[in-house]
UniProtKB/Swiss-Prot annotation:
It comes from Bacillus subtilis (strain 168). This is Uncharacterized N-acetyltransferase YjcF. PANTHER family: GLUCOSAMINE 6-PHOSPHATE N-ACETYLTRANSFERASE (PTHR13355:SF11). The keyword Cell cycle does not apply. Pfam families: Acetyltransf_10 (PF13673).
Length: 140
């Protein structure tokens, strides 16, 4: 499996495909909320298993930090290391882009995954994003 920075329309479509499968179809996030106004200012990562897109994420600069967003893995490839590949690729891209650390809003069910990757919860106060409970997390 390999992670690539989406550099063309086809790779961007692959990222959106994974996001639609996970967030829209599996988690019932409205499609109009999933694709947002931040797409063009974000750098997108796609993980491929051969030619098949199986994971995705994006990052953008926010207040000097890399804000990691839309991290997702197809159900068929969970527990296969794809999430870790996405995290490493996003963190490297953000660091290369000048980020001094990383922040993200984690679905509460995914908090243990992010803790394994060195993130800490900033506040135990949950908030809803697209109707799903989240916690803000950070890694210096």
């Amino acid at each position: 499996m390999k992670a690539v920075i989406a550099k063309n329309e086809e790779q961007l479509k692959d990222a959106f495909y994974v996001r639609e499968e996970v967030f829209v179809k599996e988690q019932n996030v409205p499609a109009e909320e999933e694709i947002d106004e931040l797409e063009n200012e974000s750098e997108h990562i796609v993980v491929y298993d051969g030619e098949k897109p199986v994971g995705a994420g994006r990052w953008r600069m926010k207040d000097g930090y890399g804000k990691l967003e839309r991290i997702c893995v197809l159900k068929s490839h969970r527990s296969a290391g794809v999430g870790g590949i996405i995290m490493k690729a996003l963190e490297k891209a953000a660091a290369d882009g000048g980020a001094s650390g990383f922040i993200l809003n984690a679905q509460t069910q995914a908090v243990p995954f992010y803790k394994k990757h060195g993130y800490r919860v900033l506040s135990e106060k949950e908030f809803l994003d697209a109707g799903i409970p989240h916690l803000q997390m950070m890694k210096d």
